């Protein structure tokens, strides 16, 4: 879910941290992508005209496979080398948030069934999107597809966005790509948003520079993490009555959650309520010391797609068009070869042009000589 209100807060205090650009501007970059986020995104967005998910003749959902296949080809076509990272086991602290999500899905499912009786197709589709959940089988199917496409993936021991950030910090990739703003809490040098959004939506890829975020907020990592916990994260609830503006003000004034709590408890006029048995310190530790595979132990290799195996998997097993799968495999193969070209900024240091020498007041410009007739 990310951090509530963080994007707007950074935009206000660190506007220079944002850079919007077309996908092609990341030519030659390796990017670690939150695959678990992609799975939800594809299952929600990749639909038929009637709003139903794509499915094969057996009724098995294939929206996620189509999403991974074509969005990956699109990125590689722009010279980007994607590496996908899948979620592992969720932290114990996240149990409360996951339970809330389950209840929301159950409520949406009830509303969806009611809508089938009285609602329009648009109404039914809206509630169907809210009931989406990713199964273990869909995870495994996506991994199998990526393997056949020659695209590397990593199974994170815990949170996918933390592992993406670790790969970026360790120099294995340029940036972490996720819609979750809490990826910044794991110190990714760069966070890319809208990387896997449908091309039809025409959303620019947003690059967020971690160093510039810290510079604009005038914070170090511990204060930033405490700010994010106050704003609201997946690991614990926050202080009632504290919104983004107040949270920022409190951290700037007191420097840590401990001192914020102390100030609130010592102020009899305060209307803010500290949650009972608030595990903010445990949440902080999850951000400061996430469970990840060290980047040095991750070997990422991009290979040629196995076209025949892809056809067998996508066409014979999942009902896709053979011609489209072969065309996609061909495009992927050509793009991977093109993508081996490096970025020019890896080889050259761009220097500013020297300023033109200022002409002194007493210096006379030489006039062009007149031609003799």
UniProtKB/Swiss-Prot annotation:
Catalytic class of the enzyme: hydrolase
Stretches the record annotates as Disordered: 347-373
Processing after translation: Phosphorylated. Phosphorylation upon DNA damage induces relocalization to the nuclear plasma.
Top-level lineage group: Eukaryota
Region listing for Interaction with PCNA, in residue ranges: 340-348
GO cellular component terms listed in the entry, alphabetical order: mitochondrion; nucleolus; nucleoplasm
Annotated compartments: Nucleus, Nucleolus; Nucleus, Nucleoplasm; Mitochondrion
PROSITE patterns reported for this sequence: XPG_1, XPG_2
Binding site for Mg(2+) 1: 34, 87, 159, 161
Region (N-domain) residue spans: 1-105
Positions of region (I-domain): 123-254
Subunit field text: Interacts with PCNA. Three molecules of FEN1 bind to one PCNA trimer with each molecule binding to one PCNA monomer. PCNA stimulates the nuclease activity without altering cleavage specificity.
Classification via PANTHER family: FLAP ENDONUCLEASE 1, FLAP ENDONUCLEASE FAMILY MEMBER
Family: Belongs to the XPG/RAD2 endonuclease family. FEN1 subfamily.
Function: Structure-specific nuclease with 5'-flap endonuclease and 5'-3' exonuclease activities involved in DNA replication and repair. During DNA replication, cleaves the 5'-overhanging flap structure that is generated by displacement synthesis when DNA polymerase encounters the 5'-end of a downstream Okazaki fragment. It enters the flap from the 5'-end and then tracks to cleave the flap base, leaving a nick for ligation. Also involved in the long patch base excision repair (LP-BER) pathway, by cleaving within the apurinic/apyrimidinic (AP) site-terminated flap.
Protein name: Flap endonuclease 1
């Amino acid at each position: 879910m990310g951090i509530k209100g963080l994007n707007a807060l950074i935009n206000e205090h660190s506007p220079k941290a944002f850079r919007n650009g077309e996908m092609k501007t990341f030519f030659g970059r390796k990017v670690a992508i939150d695959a678990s986020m992609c799975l939800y995104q594809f299952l929600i967005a990749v639909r038929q005209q009637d709003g139903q998910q794509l499915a094969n003749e057996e009724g098995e959902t294939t929206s996620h496979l189509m999403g991974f296949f074509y969005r990956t080809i699109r990125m590689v076509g722009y010279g980007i080398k994607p590496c996908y990272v899948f979620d592992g086991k969720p932290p114990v602290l996240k149990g409360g948030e996951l339970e809330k999500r389950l209840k929301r899905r159950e409520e949406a499912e009830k509303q969806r069934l009611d809508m089938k009786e009285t609602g329009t197709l648009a109404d039914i589709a809206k509630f169907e999107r809210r009931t989406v959940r990713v199964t273990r089988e869909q995870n495994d199917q996506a991994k199998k597809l990526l393997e056949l496409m020659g695209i590397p993936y990593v199974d994170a021991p815990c949170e996918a966005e933390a592992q993406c950030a670790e790969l970026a910090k360790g120099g294995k990739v340029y940036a972490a790509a996720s819609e979750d703003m809490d990826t910044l809490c794991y110190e990714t040098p760069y966070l890319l948003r809208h990387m896997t959004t449908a091309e039809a939506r025409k959303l620019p890829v947003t690059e967020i520079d971690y160093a510039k975020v810290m510079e604009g907020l005038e914070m170090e990592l511990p204060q930033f993490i405490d700010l994010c916990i106050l704003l609201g994260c997946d690991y614990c609830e926050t202080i009632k009555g504290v919104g983004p503006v107040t949270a920022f003000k409190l951290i700037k004034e007191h420097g840590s959650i401990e001192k914020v709590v102390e100030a609130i408890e010592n102020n009899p006029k305060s209307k803010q309520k500290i949650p009972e048995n608030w595990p903010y310190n445990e949440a902080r530790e999850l951000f400061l010391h996430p469970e990840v595979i060290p980047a040095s132990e991750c070997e990422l290799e991009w290979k040629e797609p196995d076209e025949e195996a892809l056809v067998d998997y996508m066409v014979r097993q999942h009902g896709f068009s053979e011609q489209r799968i072969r065309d996609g495999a061909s495009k992927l193969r050509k793009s991977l070869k093109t993508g081996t070209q490096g970025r020019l900024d890896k080889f050259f240091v761009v220097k500013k042009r020297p300023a033109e020498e200022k002409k002194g007041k007493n210096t006379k410009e030489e006039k062009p000589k007149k031609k003799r007739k």
